[in-house]
């Protein structure tokens, strides 16, 4: 394969894996450790 194709595929895989990790952190099991700033402040 050409170099440009390999670079494009690797950047795409990196972006997809980063997005998957961000979604897992936001909505998966680690999200229980995140604090909610709206619940921290009482009006």
From Swiss-Prot:
Classification via PANTHER family: PROTEIN PSBN
General function of this protein: May play a role in photosystem I and II biogenesis.
Subcellular location field: Plastid, Chloroplast thylakoid membrane
Keywords linked to the UniProt accession: Chloroplast, Membrane, Plastid, Thylakoid, Transmembrane, Transmembrane helix
InterPro entries documented for this protein: PSII_PsbN
Cellular component aspect of the GO annotation: chloroplast thylakoid membrane
Name recorded for this polypeptide: Protein PsbN
Transmembrane annotation, as ranges: 5-27
Gene this protein is translated from: psbN
Native species: Cedrus deodara
Family: Belongs to the PsbN family.
Pfam families attached to this UniProt entry: PsbN
GO annotation, biological process: photosynthesis
Bilayer disposition of the protein: Single-pass membrane protein
């Amino acid at each position: 394969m050409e170099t440009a194709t390999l670079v494009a595929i690797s950047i795409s895989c990196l972006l997809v894996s980063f997005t998957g990790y961000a979604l897992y952190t936001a909505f998966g099991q680690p999200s229980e450790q995140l604090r909610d700033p709206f619940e921290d402040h009482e009006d």
